[in-house]
Curated annotation (Swiss-Prot):
Keyword DNA repair recorded: yes
UniProt cross-references to SUPFAM superfamilies, sorted A to Z: UBC-like
Protein's pathway: Protein modification; protein ubiquitination
GO biological process: chromatin organization; DNA repair; protein ubiquitination; sporulation resulting in formation of a cellular spore
Name of the protein in its database record: Ubiquitin-conjugating enzyme E2 2
Subcellular location per the Swiss-Prot or TrEMBL entry: Cytoplasm; Nucleus
Family: Belongs to the ubiquitin-conjugating enzyme family.
Catalytic activity: S-ubiquitinyl-[E1 ubiquitin-activating enzyme]-L-cysteine + [E2 ubiquitin-conjugating enzyme]-L-cysteine = [E1 ubiquitin-activating enzyme]-L-cysteine + S-ubiquitinyl-[E2 ubiquitin-conjugating enzyme]-L-cysteine
Gene: UBC2
Entry keywords, A to Z: ATP-binding, Chromatin regulator, Cytoplasm, DNA damage, DNA repair, Nucleotide-binding, Nucleus, Sporulation, Transcription, Transcription regulation, Transferase, Ubl conjugation pathway
Function: Catalyzes the covalent attachment of ubiquitin to other proteins. Plays a role in transcription regulation by catalyzing the monoubiquitination of histone H2B to form H2BK123ub1. H2BK123ub1 gives a specific tag for epigenetic transcriptional activation and is also a prerequisite for H3K4me and H3K79me formation. Also involved in postreplication repair of UV-damaged DNA, in N-end rule-dependent protein degradation and in sporulation.
Gene Ontology MF annotations: ATP binding; ubiquitin conjugating enzyme activity
């Protein structure tokens, strides 16, 4: 069945193949364009550098009018990531726009890694360490980077 959401997701997929943003990749799972597997590489010169973080993106038929649900599969220690892997990111909630595509979502998440919003933490411990003890925060992040290589 070809719906507007599915057509849009196929366009997003073609764009990811022909003009991939640096450090992110994504593609639909076999036989289901509404579920995507994605990978974000930790940005250079950040505690997340060289990490390979896996995510799953779940789209509904209302896409692009409704944002996807995005969740880290890889362990993540970050102020804006819940223990479940779900993200607290404004563009996935109240600041969503139908102009955003898969690439925009993933690059926004990649940017969030080194620029967390500590005013709205999903992980209070990570937020407090980020603000008050950057050395320990960096150590904990580096531990998740090393675990990401094992996934």
């Amino acid at each position: 069945m070809s719906t507007a959401a599915r057509r849009r997701l196929m366009r997003d997929f073609k764009r990811m193949q022909t003009d991939p943003p640096a450090g992110v990749s994504a593609s639909p799972v076999p036989d289901n364009v509404m579920t995507w597997n994605a990978v974000i590489i930790g940005p250079a010169d950040t505690p997340f550098e060289d990490g390979t973080f896996r995510l799953v993106m779940q789209f509904e038929e209302q896409y692009p009018n409704k944002p996807p649900q995005v969740k880290f599969i890889s362990e993540m220690f970050h102020p804006n990531v819940y223990a479940t892997g779900e993200l607290c990111l404004d563009i996935l909630q109240n600041r969503w726009s139908p102009t955003y595509d898969v690439a925009a979502v993933l690059t926004s998440i990649q940017s969030l890694l080194n620029d967390p919003n500590t005013g709205s933490p999903a992980n209070v411990e990570a937020s407090n360490l980020y603000k008050d003890n950057r050395k320990e925060y960096t150590k904990r992040v580096r531990e998740t980077v090393e675990k990401s290589w094992e996934d």
